Amino acid sequence: MTIRRRTGLTLVGIACALFVVLIFLLPLLLNADRYRTKLVSYLEGKTGKKVEIGRLAVTFSPGLAIQVNDFGVKSPPLFPPSYIVKVARIDAQLDVRSLLHRQVVIKSLVLEQPTINLVSDPDGPWNFENPGPQNTPSTFPFGVVSRVEIRRGHVTLSNLLPSDAAGPVFFEAHDISSELENVNVDAIADPASTTLDGEGTLKAGLLRFGSIEAKNLISSIRLQARQVLFTDVKAETDGGNATGELSIKLSGKNASFKTDARMKGIDVAHLLMAFPGARGKMTGKMEGELKIAGEIEHSRHPLEGLHGSGHLTVRNGDVPSLRLNANLMKLAHYNDLGPAKNDPSSFNFVSTDLELDRERITSKVIDIDGYGVDLDGSGTVSLSGSDELNYQGVAEIVSQQGFVTNLIARLAGGTLKDSKLSFPFHIGGTIDSPVFAKGSKGKKVN
């Protein structure tokens, strides 16, 4: 057989294949939107949820694709009226070879401006979970999509309250761009899935978890066994930056999360602005490490059950309501406050460990270098709204007082050594109204 003849047969074969594809697609190409109702019915049967499609079209650049405009999937009746997902436009690129066998295989998906709203019911299920197919054929399973791209997306997660009323949003991400590989669309909606359902990269202009905000976030992301895992996270937050990992688990009656974060250059005053009860309570620049985890409860305060540990340092700040330097000097009966006169509440350096357990912070080793006063201590503070303080330790004051003042201070319980007066102290009351005393009990400082 000559080369020319083989070439001719090859061209004829290709032409025949294209003809078969054309016959299969011709009705769709002439008016794709006429199949919109059938596609909606199919998707509703497959997902068990109400589906909306504004318009269907076929495009040829950069490849053969179905374009879906104004796509929406509504939450099931168990949930308040809402959408699970709304997408302005979806471009689904098809595998032409599979069409020869009358099979529809999606090679890639591009989602323009998707809004994803995930809601958990107190009894356990999420609004996106698939209750199971309802007598629909399995000739077109979504399966694994090789590539999924998200452009300008938004995601929110929230819980319903025990009354089934809408609860607060505990996680949200805005201006999302993401590229994912090998996304198992069927498994994501399957509550029994244990597979790796996709992985890739993610960028977000703004991410908020509880009251904590991060901007210009970049991370790797993995969807696996009902979990979303963010790794190699880098973000800007409160004038500084943060790195670490975050995972959110969506299985079980309550969702749960775990984070391991490292922070540097955080503006404490800006950070506390997110917490109404803590605004204006402290300033300074903070750095440190935190590991926090917990269940996300179906309540108006879904993150109140958190627990964790870490170590923080804050430099060049103050705690206005405590007036720590001045109050401790008065407690020692010092009339000349020295540097504390001009900086009654300021400090050079604070270093502390911490353990968080249901809105109470416990610190075993606290080191504070103030102006004229240094102290070592330990104690607890409540974050539940009472702001209750319970701290104790030993304060050390550089002694530049006269003989009589030093004598009175020593008689009051202090110890003078190397021109430094040290004495035990206790701080009770609240952050706004602290009560200073010697030891565990003593005279209140006015």
Regions found by a protein language model. Name each.
Residues 63-86, 105-123, 146-161, 167-184, ...:
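Small-residue helix/turn framework positions
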Residues 130-141:
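Intrinsic-disorder/low-complexity linker and hinge segments
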Residues 431-446:
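Gram-negative outer-membrane assembly/targeting C-terminal domains
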Residues 92-98, 222-226, 434:
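Short, surface-exposed linear segments at secondary-structure transitions and domain or protein termini
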